[in-house]
Amino acid sequence: RLNEQDVFVPALVKVASEHPNQKLLLLACGDDYAKLIIKNKQELLPHFAVPYIDESLMERIVLKENFYEICEQYGFAYPKTALCTFENKDEFNMDFTYPIIIKASNSVAYWNCSFPGKKKVFVAHDVAEKNAIIKAIYESTYKDNLTIQEFIPGDDSFMRVLNAYVGKDGKVKLMSLGNPILEEHSPEGIGSYAAIINTFDEALLDKVRFFLEDIGYNGFANFDMKYDSRDGEYKLFEINLRNGRSSYYVTASGHNLMQYVADDHMLNIPQELTYAKDKHLWMIIPKGVLFKYGKEGPLLDEARQLIEEGKVTNHLYYSEDFSPKRWVKLTLNNLNYYRKYKKYFNNKGLS
């Protein structure tokens, strides 16, 4: 029940009261908790350092339809997009061609619904498939909007992820750009990155830095985008207000994300702008899965080279937190990845 409004603030205030002489830093790992922190920021500030934006800015950038309006203002490209509502679901159509992406506009509400064939993101290749997916979603408890987008051509390696930390002074302190090699393909994991190599694009980083500073952002920001080979532009999908699981690729490359926020809010250590450039491979899947399902080419060759050089990290493996029981669990987890990729690879329909 911690994710319920009437429980959330009292529970956190109680935690703070148990540490009266300590400065506490409040961070969220999920969308629902990040939003709760932001909505209750003024009540929490007397008890915690709260490195998050205000609610008014959150409302402008979290819903995808609002985010794309801001993209227009700042010159960011984004996929052709249409909005399907519960009210217009039976007549809904869009003015772009198949295949299309179908995903929930409200990720928190979607997370809490259930229906047969549920996936984090769907790909529909024709009208019949589109209608079946929309019907299945709206027969569940989810009644919020659906974002319908053109499918940007290219495999997982065309994706990019950009992580940033913006200090309490409103200035960007750290930016890192990652090139995913492979995503997860299980129903609940579609779109979550499974292997990333750091890359660098100064023009893109400069553009995003100006955007974050100009809108008054602070705290962690995480952008998902895809390179469109048709016009040579990055198409922005969304901004997340917190780090994701794969954000450890930044720390693995030598720039500890948690150190940035701790130095800024807890220790008041001045920080200069850093663009991460060092190459490193982060992965959460076994190497066998990466090289079986990753697309052969320069990026996969680079992964092989980084592994050979020892520049590779799977953050589940930590020598200070290891035991026979944990080893068994991680081994089973790896075996499960082989099973999941065999079963679900490139299956993004309703079946």
Residue ranges and their predicted role:
Residues 1-15:
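Glycine-rich, highly charged phosphate/nucleotide-binding loops
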Residues 16, 58-146, 168-169, 203:
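Active-site nucleotide/adenylate-binding loops and adjacent lid/helix of ATP-dependent enzymes
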Residues 19-62, 77-80:
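A short, GP-enriched loop/loop-strand-helix hinge that lies immediately N-terminal to
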Residues 124-184, 199-200, 206, 227, ...:
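Phosphate-binding site of ATP-dependent enzymes
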Residues 181-193, 240-254:
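Glycine-rich phosphate/pyrophosphate-binding beta-alpha loops
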Residues 189-190, 198-223:
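Oxyanion-binding "anion nests"
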Residues 213-248:
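Conserved metal-phosphate-binding beta-hairpin within the catalytic cores
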Residues 263-351:
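Peripheral (often C-terminal) accessory segments that flank ATP-dependent C-N-forming ligase machineries
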